[in-house]
């Protein structure tokens, strides 16, 4: 076995059954569950994120769930720091960190590290916000196109958070975000096709999804309708009533939430909201599959198979995660 402590990544698209398998693994192994989900971090956003129930969380505690208010932001860099701390604590207790979720950017940040970006600066952000109010975000998008055309091509003018961040990075250091990312790629000596990574762990990577895409689509539609039956609209109404929340926040832009928000604003009918929520979730799953197809060293399992737990345990022994 490797001298490095073990860790397990359990990835997959939304509605694939990751949580159920993670809990089964936690029953079978001395694991500590760590959420890798950019929506589950928010308090008060339970139904639309398919957050495990309070009863399940009491039985299977997850780190990095309910750690932010919906008015707050949370970056991949913050996740990396929090996840590494949670993994270190689990290892110190003699337990295996089991990271489960579908936010692929977070996994990538863990494995490869992040570009050495400057931190957020309140004064610079306030100046950008003032310019946006005076001139509009499209004018700021044109500014970005002059100094960082690659980021401008990637960021929509109606995405103020990412637009502000790209301008902030340039104004703080005089170097574009695109150049910083290229520098990171060139310096990424600790990560290559052989599977080396910047984590001080021996990592086994599992992925779960239905073999047939139409099966996943049916599960997505069924789950979204179940969320509506469980009170999803009332959950978003509580958020909508808060004066400090708006449609531009990362929390409210989460899949499902932005569609219900538009419904509450009178922009969509109930039927349109339902259809668009399902379509948006399917698009999320497609993006997750795109990430996963480019991933190396993944062990895939079929969501519909009845023997995923023994198969996962067998694989973990094969790659020396388990004795």
Curated annotation (Swiss-Prot):
One BP annotation, GO: tRNA modification
InterPro entries: Dimethylallyltransferase (IPR039657), IPT (IPR018022), P-loop_NTPase (IPR027417)
Keyword check for Magnesium: yes
Residues binding substrate: 14-19
UniProt-listed Gene3D superfamilies: 1.10.20.140, P-loop containing nucleotide triphosphate hydrolases
Keywords: ATP-binding, Magnesium, Nucleotide-binding, Transferase, tRNA processing
Pfam families referenced in this protein's UniProt entry, alphabetically: IPPT
Cofactor: Mg(2+)
Site description Interaction with substrate tRNA, residues in chain: 103, 125
E.C. designation(s): 2.5.1.75
GO MF term set: ATP binding; tRNA dimethylallyltransferase activity
Residue positions binding ATP: 12-19
TM regions (residue ranges): none
Catalytic activity: adenosine(37) in tRNA + dimethylallyl diphosphate = N(6)-dimethylallyladenosine(37) in tRNA + diphosphate
Region described as Interaction with substrate tRNA: spans on this chain: 37-40, 161-165, 253-258, 286-293
Superkingdom as given in the UniProt entry: Bacteria
Group of enzyme by EC: transferase
Functional note: Catalyzes the transfer of a dimethylallyl group onto the adenine at position 37 in tRNAs that read codons beginning with uridine, leading to the formation of N6-(dimethylallyl)adenosine (i(6)A).
NCBIfam families: miaA
Subunit structure, as described in the record: Monomer.
Record-stated family: Belongs to the IPP transferase family.
Protein name: tRNA dimethylallyltransferase
Native source species: Pseudomonas aeruginosa (strain ATCC 15692 / DSM 22644 / CIP 104116 / JCM 14847 / LMG 12228 / 1C / PRS 101 / PAO1)
Taxonomic classification: Bacteria, Pseudomonadati, Pseudomonadota, Gammaproteobacteria, Pseudomonadales
